[in-house]
C-alpha cells in the first residue's frame, strides 16, 4: 500500500501559484468558490442462498465537505478543489472469521486485526487545477466517468483515483481528454493502492501497475447524435479501444434512444509473454486459457420513452479467451456496460446477455423527484470447465428527492437485487440510503 502524496503536492502547487498572483487577480478564485456539505446514511444486507454462510450486514454514516474554488484571473487561471470525507460505523455486522456466526462484516469498512470493522475511517482528496481558454488540467484526486474507467460509488464512501487529466473544449461540439492514473483509493480504505485486473489482484502472485494511460473524444455530430472514441492502457496488462454511438430519435409519439458500444481489448507488456504471465500478470478468463488478455465486447440497447415511461431492450456479446479487462482491485467496480448490474457485470469470457428494463418518472403525473426502475439480465454460454455456465440478475430501485420546503435536499433510495446461476453464489441484496445535501456558499 502507498500513501498518496500526489494530491498533496498538487494542492501545494496550485495554492502556491494562486498566492503568487496579485490580490486583485485572486478575487475570482474566492468569488466563484463553492462548498457543499453532504450526509449519507447507508445500510446494506447480503444473504447467500445456496451456501451455508452467514449473511453480510453493515450500516454507517458518512459526512462529505466538497469545496471547489474559482480560478485566478488572467490568461492562465489556477484553482484548488478539496473533497474531505469521513465514515462512522453504526453497525459493523459482527466479526469476520468467527466460528458459528450468523452475520459477518461486508466491504463497507476496513477490518481490524480481530476481524471487526473499524469504528471510523476517512480521507481527503485534493486537486490542483489550471485553466487556459476552454482547456482545463487537473492534478490530484479524480472521479473519472469515461467508457474506459468509471469510479465506483456503491458503498458509503466512493472509490477515488489519483493522477492527472486534461480536458479541452476548444472546438465546438468536440470534447477531448487525456491523462494518466497512478493509484486508486478503494471505497473501504483510507490508503492508496496500485492498479490491477481480475485474475492478478490477489494472492501470493498478485501484480500491480502504476500506469494507466487514457485518451478520448466525444463528438456531437448533431443535436441528436453523439460519437465516441476512447483508449485505455494499463501497462503490463491490457490495451483497450472503445467506440460508441448514442442517437435520440424524436418520433411522432415518444422517442427512441439507440446506444451502441464496442470494446476491443488486447494484451500489453508482461501479459503478452509467457514469462510475464508466470510472474502473475494474468487475466481471469475461459477454462484452460493462458491468462493473456484477448477480448471483444459489443452491445446494443434500445430505449423507447413516452410520458414518463421508458422501456429498454438490449443484447451484449463477449468473445475471446479472457474476461472483459478493466481496473479491478476486488472491492467493487463500475463498468460502462449495459450489463453493469447492482451485483454482477455479465462480462465473462464467451458470455451472451439479454437485458430488459422498465423505468418510470412520476413527475409525469405530478410527483417530481420520485422514480422507479426495474431491470433484468440473463446471461449464458459462459466458458467454464465441463460446460457453459449461465446466470441471471434482477435489479429494482426506487428513488425520491424532496423538491422544496424545509426538507429540500433530502433524498431516499432503496435498491434490491437477486442473482442466481451455476457459476457462483446465489445472492439477495438490499441497500437503503438516506442523503442530504446543503450548499454552504
Question: Where do the model's predicted regions map?
Answer:
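Beta-barrel outer-membrane channel/assembly domains of diderm bacteria
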Residues: 16-144, 363, 388-393, 397-403, ...
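Outer-membrane beta-barrel translocator/channel fold
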Residues: 88-90, 177-199, 206-211, 254-335, ...
